[in-house]
Amino acid sequence: MRPPQCLLHTPSLASPLLLLLLWLLGGGVGAEGREDAELLVTVRGGRLRGIRLKTPGGPVSAFLGIPFAEPPMGPRRFLPPEPKQPWSGVVDATTFQSVCYQYVDTLYPGFEGTEMWNPNRELSEDCLYLNVWTPYPRPTSPTPVLVWIYGGGFYSGASSLDVYDGRFLVQAERTVLVSMNYRVGAFGFLALPGSREAPGNVGLLDQRLALQWVQENVAAFGGDPTSVTLFGESAGAASVGMHLLSPPSRGLFHRAVLQSGAPNGPWATVGMGEARRRATQLAHLVGCPPGGTGGNDTELVACLRTRPAQVLVNHEWHVLPQESVFRFSFVPVVDGDFLSDTPEALINAGDFHGLQVLVGVVKDEGSYFLVYGAPGFSKDNESLISRAEFLAGVRVGVPQVSDLAAEAVVLHYTDWLHPEDPARLREALSDVVGDHNVVCPVAQLAGRLAAQGARVYAYVFEHRASTLSWPLWMGVPHGYEIEFIFGIPLDPSRNYTAEEKIFAQRLMRYWANFARTGDPNEPRDPKAPQWPPYTAGAQQYVSLDLRPLEVRRGLRAQACAFWNRFLPKLLSATDTLDEAERQWKAEFHRWSSYMVHWKNQFDHYSKQDRCSDL
């Protein structure tokens, strides 16, 4: 045994290979194995090696970039996902994998407010990976699981974004957190209903497959598959709602959190006819032949599969039927399968007894979208708009309604004591877009779920982060509660205030309490301010900001009565009038044609009579 000891003291012979050999012979496996045991996990597909991450409160284990589906590339483009086949060896799960192909926002290059939502990994169609964060050391008893679905209008988003870093929430609350990538844009939601080659909703099916993976594998990470809470924001929240409404998904989770989005939002779904129109329009734009209702669909999809991914992305926005804000090209389709009916119909007909749901919005849901196309708006000025710009903004903020309906919106949102005031018009258009697309669909969903047996909690998030880069006039924009839910202020490299760190800890506790019990309140402190359930009658919700909980009633009740009650009746009445007018005009046209024909016949007959008399 002398030679190895001598060699160990001979620097010239201490090559990396030799040191590795000596480490193996000297018991390094046992010593390192005790540390690595937390980072080695076996799931149904094979073995994974994770990474230990630091937080101010201690370490967590992270398993990043776990494959859960076969790459949806080539002939698999537009098709439902296929589970990942088992692998040999150990998959390196120490870093995030590629982001699904998508549109990249270049409106404000280098601006933190937009760059934070842009992909932070390379784009690829090989993107169906998920991530798991778990306490270090791993829980010895089953731990509640939170599963995150990102937003992004169904056209963008990635689970690898810094704002979705799960380490702080997991360390603070000792939960297990899972997030997944899913296909977006045409790759996830292009639909030719009735076609097996592009059935639509495959992005939702990606999410469902990840939920099935959680049921099969999360116990290996210390998670409890019988206590899974699905949570998401914006399009992620709409996705959560669609899983609530789709029976094959419903059994894969047990509680739901919908942040700033709902499946009944006017932007969240399209019908089969519009889905087909958009798909064939995209095909036309990229030089593929039009499809029909039969075999031509196969040819159209085959052609679309030959087009480079970036080419499809470049043309996606051109399929929208008109200029608009808060409308997206490829979204879930009411296909009779994943969604057996419209979300509104499914919500109204559903049985939600025993369901536990947390829903909410931020203070200024509409402001973010105005700088993406509303007349007169920009992040670089105060956006003090004119009356004419407000009127034009209503038409892009509420597309596809009649002139009478648009006039009703203008009437409701105008401050008639100051109808020309630019600041009031700016705030009014922000409210139009936010109420129409987020606040009132969420309020409608909360009321219906509560009326049908669900236990619902509701909030309005009202704190503007001290680090926010968007201008002050935008208030608390869409998406800017997320950093607090994930505990990002606890990152010592960031410049949040001490009060914001405490606030983030409060919010993480509310979300974790809900994941554990279905109730966000602190069970160990009955003297703490209580968050009451939201009921269809009382409509109680809480304000979330740096102050203690404040209970309020009626989530923008007047505005939502307009959107959820009055406007649908107006649209229905005008649709009836329009149909009556169409029928009257058609009958008048037929009568006029008949009279012209009768007159011609009569004239011909009269001439014949006169000739016979001669």
Swiss-Prot record:
Effect of D435N: Misfolding, absence of secretion
Compartment(s) where it occurs, according to its Swiss-Prot or TrEMBL record: Synapse; Secreted; Cell membrane
Entry keyword Transmembrane helix: no
Chief place where the protein resides: other
GO molecular function ontology, one term from the record: collagen binding
Tissues where this protein is expressed: Isoform H is highly expressed in erythrocytes.
Effect noted on mutating H478A: Loss of activity
Annotated binding of huperzine A, by residue: W117, Y164, Y368
Quaternary structure, from the entry: Interacts with PRIMA1. The interaction with PRIMA1 is required to anchor it to the basal lamina of cells and organize into tetramers. Isoform H generates GPI-anchored dimers; disulfide linked. Isoform T generates multiple structures, ranging from monomers and dimers to collagen-tailed and hydrophobic-tailed forms, in which catalytic tetramers are associated with anchoring proteins that attach them to the basal lamina or to cell membranes.
UniProt-recorded name of the protein: Acetylcholinesterase
Organismal lineage: Eukaryota, Metazoa, Chordata, Craniata, Vertebrata
